[in-house]
Amino acid sequence: MVSIRLARGGAKKRPFYHVVVAESRSKRDGRYIERVGFFNPIARGQEERLRLDESRIAYWIGTGAKPSDRVVSLIKEFKKQQQV
């Protein structure tokens, strides 16, 4: 089963996440099919906190990929951010 989830990057105590489409059996930070965005939870000032490729996410959800709970909330946040 294909899922849309977060893959952790960054340094110790400085997390940075890539939003990836991956096979659900793959390791958290392992092999992925496509990277569709990023999430920086500790962004400060003018740094970009969240970027998603909505068209690719819609495509993958249409093909049956299941987004994780956190990714669903990030998608909602991104759409809200786009409206402002």
Swiss-Prot record:
GO terms for molecular function: structural constituent of ribosome. The keyword Ribosomal protein applies. It comes from the Bacteria. GO terms for biological process: translation. GO terms for cellular component: cytoplasm; small ribosomal subunit. NCBIfam families: S16. Belongs to the bacterial ribosomal protein bS16 family. This is Small ribosomal subunit protein bS16. It comes from Methylococcus capsulatus (strain ATCC 33009 / NCIMB 11132 / Bath).
